[in-house]
Amino acid sequence: MVKILAVEDEALVRILIVETLADAGHSVVEAPDGESALAIVKETPDLDLIVTDVRMSKMDGFSLARFAREIRPDLPVLFMTGYMGSDVPANIPGAKVLQKPFDPDDLLAAIDVMLAARP
């Protein structure tokens, strides 16, 4: 079973993401912000993927990804954002961006592509 960390500061959006992933058979750990998510990355060595909002309080998604990659350089990251032009920084290779709003099927398809690309 794939274990995914879902990071989203808007509770209703986070619930939708968690339910979508769980219904698809994934194990899901959730966090309301980047700081909480980073603590989970440190404590959970078997994470397969991070799905994170870009703009959040305390720590944005790009910072979360950079710090998480210091711990787990191979950990894939899928960014979600409602802001056009949010490109993945060059120092986060292999990460992808999913534009909000998105259909749950689009989220699952993006995750499938990222998981299939893992070594």
Predicted features along the sequence, with ranges:
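Charged docking surfaces used in two-component/phosphorelay signaling
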Residues: 15-23
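Active-site residues of response regulator receiver
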Residues: 53
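C-terminal output helix
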Residues: 18, 102-115
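Conserved acidic carboxylate
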Residues: 8
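Hydrophobic/aromatic residues positioned on beta-strands within the core alpha/beta folds
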Residues: 80-81
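Receiver (REC) domain active-site loop signature in two-component systems and cognate sites
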Residues: 56
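Acidic, metal-coordinating helix/loop segments flanking the phosphotransfer/catalytic sites
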Residues: 5, 30-49
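Acidic catalytic/metal-coordinating carboxylates
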Residues: 33-36, 59-64
